[in-house]
Amino acid sequence: MSIDNELSKCRNIGIMAHIDAGKTTTTERILFYTGKQNRIGEVHEGAASMDWMEQEKERGITITSAATTCFWNGHRINIIDTPGHVDFTIEVERSLRVLDGAVAVFDGVAGVEPQSETVWRQADKYNVPRICFMNKMDRMGADFYRCVDMVVERLGATPLVLQLPIGIEKDFVGVVDLLEMRSIIWDEDSLGASFHYGEIPKDMLDKAQEYRNKLLESAVELNDEAMNLYFEGKEISVSLLKSCIRAGVIQSKFVPVLCGSAFKNRGVQPLLDAVVDFLPAPNDIPMMEALDVKTSNTINIKSSIDGKFVALAFKVMTDKFVGSLTFIRIYSGRLSSKTTVLNAVKNSTESIGRILLMHANNREDITEAKAGDIVALAGLKKTVTGDTLCTLDQPIILERMEFPEPVMEIAVEPKSTADQEKMGIALSRLVAEDPSLGMCVNPESGQTILKGMGELHLEVIVDRMRREFNVEANIGAPQVAYRETITKSVEIEYIHKKQTGGAGQFAKVNILFEPLPPGSGFQFESKITGGAIPKEYIPGVQNGLENIRGSGMLAGFPVIDFKATLVDGAFHEVDSSPLAFELAAKGAFRDMVNKAGAILLEPIMKVEIITPDEYMGDVIGDINSRRGRVAEMQDRHNTKVILAFIPLAKMFGYVKDLRSMSQGRAQYSMYFSCYEQVPDNIVANEIKTK
């Protein structure tokens, strides 16, 4: 069957949520009902097609974002199923960067959970329009209306309810469609593939009319024609109402809310309708800003098939059959195999060989891709996550992605000489795939240090190293990735001077060091005027600071959240060089640390604990003993929900302790919140161990 693949018929969406909310289960139903696959893969059976890694099948969780394409009502839908576990947040981040819309899946019992908040904020960051799907409405304790309230309270969003559940918990059978004012009931015998429309149950008519009125009040505000009809008391057609909702979603004025039970095969087809009806096409999104490399001016890139080729690489992975795969989102133009493109970030060319459409880890060769497409390119040599690919005659750079700092590290030692050789190759490939993974060598012990986002993240990396690269290694106990920063502004003058006979080394720098707000990272600025330092030497100053800040003077941890401004300096016509200025910058940094009030920072985790009432006292007492602070407590049915902030250093082994104090009935989830100053007594111990 031929299909119109023009931009208006394309949707690029992500499925995002907290772990265990049902993202992958929802995606599997979407693939089944759209005909992409003829069977339903269940997560709990390790058979979900989108969870193709061995680690995903064993753990029943999504670890890496998986891409696929399906068709619904004449529209092409490119889907990325993202992880819900906090350790793999980077997969959500880079997926949202290239998506036009998203479906946020919520557990109908738990509502808005901590990682739900994290991915929602990430979607806010990239202005991604979204739809809410309240899943698991068949489960005991499911409460649709409380979930809608939590969207307002916790996410600060404006929900637009389009459906109401018919029946509660095990009696959930279908939904009330508030657009058409009818019921939709699913047929169990057909695995939910068939359903029928009917009258709204009499006991729900009043509530349906109440929410229909709320829907109309919000939707008509964006359309004069609809607003006039509404105030005149006249009927508003479904097509006009959908047009109003679509405009509101694209402008992020509100978020449509639907409900269902993906596992019980109810509610997925209307969700697909909503994706097509309300989420934006590539040509609906605002023009993207880019840097014109030739002029250094900011330009706007319009999503157009007829424009010049522009794409962003958002993911790199290794495929054992194909080799290196680079996932790209094409924003403009066309890309054909056997052509050459420019990596504008690296200022190098890449030859395009195979262009692949992906379905999880299955590949389909195509000869051409165009604006709006998400495809994988085989065999690129230099391109990494965040690089821009474009035509040779129009070098431009799209806004790059920001990645979080690792919060945990482990020492990795190969068991044999053969393992040592393979480990270097394995880790270099894994680091290239995952921007949230870091690697360095401890200069004192010679150990390889692997840095990641949490215990599970590092555990999966080590497991992949063993399975995919046949590397056996001894693994050290996880350690907290502390950081250092400064608390005072100070200007340092430093002269680097060295005479060795013949040409010497000379560089003088005046650098103003200033503390920055948490999360700012490192910033460098040059305010050199009048040729005090030739411009070709200034990158040496920045490189010197970048290199030395990786190992602070206080305890040897990276220094973050500060700005260095090069305000003055001097050079020698013969003895100055970029290396001399790099060494001068390092000397200035060493002098600065002792004068700028250096402090040690530790990662603080936001922890949500769900516990039966009778264990709440023990749980709170334990939080206090871990240097934690309770921020909020809520009732949720017969349990208490405790929101706390606890240092990561005190969270090792917490799952075992929590099970012990609650007889296995309490559970928790955590994710990175911020870095905070370490108490003085802890600083002393940490410096001693370093």
Swiss-Prot record:
Main location, first listed in the record:
cytoplasm
Which molecular function GO terms apply here?
Answer: GTP binding; GTPase activity; translation elongation factor activity
Positions that bind GTP: 17-24, 81-85, 135-138
InterPro entries, sorted: EF-G-like_DII, EFG_II, EFG_III, EFG_III/V, EFG_IV, EFG_V, EFG_V-like, G_TR_CS
Q: Which domain of life is it from?
A: Bacteria
Looking up Pfam families in the UniProt record yields: EF-G_D2, EFG_C, EFG_III, EFG_IV, GTP_EFTU
Kindly list the places in or outside the cell where this protein is found, as annotated in its UniProt entry: Cytoplasm
For this record, the Gene Ontology CC terms, alphabetical, are: cytoplasm
GO terms in the biological process aspect are: ribosome disassembly
Q: Where is the tr-type G domain?
A: 8-283
Keywords assigned by UniProt? Cytoplasm, Elongation factor, GTP-binding, Nucleotide-binding, Protein biosynthesis
Cross-referenced HAMAP family: EF_G_EF_2_B
Q: Which family does it belong to?
A: Belongs to the TRAFAC class translation factor GTPase superfamily. Classic translation factor GTPase family. EF-G/EF-2 subfamily.
* PANTHER family given in the database record: RIBOSOME-RELEASING FACTOR 2, MITOCHONDRIAL (PTHR43261:SF1), TRANSLATION ELONGATION FACTOR G-RELATED (PTHR43261)
Q: What does this protein do?
A: Catalyzes the GTP-dependent ribosomal translocation step during translation elongation. During this step, the ribosome changes from the pre-translocational (PRE) to the post-translocational (POST) state as the newly formed A-site-bound peptidyl-tRNA and P-site-bound deacylated tRNA move to the P and E sites, respectively. Catalyzes the coordinated movement of the two tRNA molecules, the mRNA and conformational changes in the ribosome.
Q: What name does UniProt use for this protein?
A: Elongation factor G
What is the species listed in this Swiss-Prot or TrEMBL entry? Answer: Ehrlichia chaffeensis (strain ATCC CRL-10679 / Arkansas)
